[in-house]
């Protein structure tokens, strides 16, 4: 077996896709792109399983291969049915005039948050690397593999940028520090939202971040799992229903049977 893998069995697909186990043998394997395989949602799954715009792969191909371009990810036309969309990406469907932001719910499943035309013009980026390139040009790399040259010198690794997709400019940024609202992007607490209480430094190991949600529930996670959502309590984006507060088993049961 030389070269890259080209197939993905449905039973081995990420749980976040919520695929029907009996819906066939295969799932669309995401192409190489800005997000990792297990942290992405390919366009074909998004169109078939989430938006119900297509019944099969042929329908997906017809939608994506529209002459003028029908599906835009971060303001760019995408025609590859395996293109990996991921956290904070803005997906626009031209024919239906709809825009969505890709987020996780509190159970770690991908959800699409509907956006207005103004909200669809920007996205949030987490800074993952910072360096100085050839000719002493400073640059930063973000979680969706963007390279931005000549950033504000105050921006550090772990900070969040509010990025204008139309003009390709950084509008604003928020530091990874106590008092800011954050979103958990990985781990057991994925999808939860809360305010950073304090950060424990552990030399040679993982730094731990303590967070408290809107209901006062406290939890801790690795610092690398934190995605800052804004400065203080002011959010740069709108959250999906539930506002990132995880229900207990009893609360969920009560909600389901309260009809």
UniProtKB/Swiss-Prot annotation:
Residue list for modification Phosphothreonine: 248
Q: Which UniProt keywords apply?
A: Phosphoprotein, Ribonucleoprotein, Ribosomal protein, RNA-binding, rRNA-binding
The Phosphoserine modification is found at 258
Any single biological process term in GO: translation
Looking up Pfam families in the UniProt record yields: 40S_S4_C, Ribosomal_S4e, RS4NT
| GO MF, any single term | rRNA binding
Q: Tell me which InterPro entries the record gives.
A: Rib_uL2_dom2, Ribosomal_eS4, Ribosomal_eS4_C, Ribosomal_eS4_central_region, Ribosomal_eS4_central_sf, Ribosomal_eS4_KOW, Ribosomal_eS4_N, Ribosomal_eS4_N_CS
Residue limits of the S4 RNA-binding domain?
A: 41-105
* Superkingdom of this protein's organism: Eukaryota
GO CC, alphabetical: cytosolic small ribosomal subunit
Family according to the record: Belongs to the eukaryotic ribosomal protein eS4 family.
What protein is this chain from? Small ribosomal subunit protein eS4
């Amino acid at each position: 077996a030389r070269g890259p893998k080209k197939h993905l069995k449905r039973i081995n697909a990420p749980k976040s896709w919520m695929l029907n186990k009996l819906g066939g043998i295969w799932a669309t394997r995401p192409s190489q792109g800005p997000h990792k395989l297990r942290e992405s949602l390919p366009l074909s799954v998004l169109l078939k399983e989430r938006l119900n715009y297509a019944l099969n792969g042929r329908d997906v191909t017809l939608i994506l291969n529209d002459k003028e371009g029908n599906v835009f990810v971060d303001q760019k036309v995408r025609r590859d049915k395996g293109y990996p969309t991921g956290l904070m990406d803005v997906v626009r469907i031209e024919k239906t005039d709809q825009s969505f932001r890709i987020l996780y719910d509190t159970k770690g499943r991908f959800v699409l948050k509907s956006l207005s035309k103004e909200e669809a013009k920007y996205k949030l980026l987490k800074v993952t690397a910072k360096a100085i390139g050839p000719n002493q040009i400073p640059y930063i790399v973000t979680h969706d593999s963007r390279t931005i040259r000549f950033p504000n010198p105050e921006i550090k690794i772990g900070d969040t940028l509010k990025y204008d997709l139309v003009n390709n400019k950084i509008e604003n940024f928020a530091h990874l520090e106590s008092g800011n609202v954050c979103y958990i992007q990985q781990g057991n607490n994925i999808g939860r939202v809360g305010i950073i209480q304090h950060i424990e430094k552990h030399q040679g190991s993982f730094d731990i971040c303590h967070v408290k949600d809107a209901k006062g529930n406290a939890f801790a996670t690795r610092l690398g799992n934190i995605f800052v959502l804004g400065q203080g309590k002011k959010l740069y984006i709108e959250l999906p229903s539930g506002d990132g507060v995880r229900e207990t088993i009893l609360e969920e049961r009560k909600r389901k049977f309260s009809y």
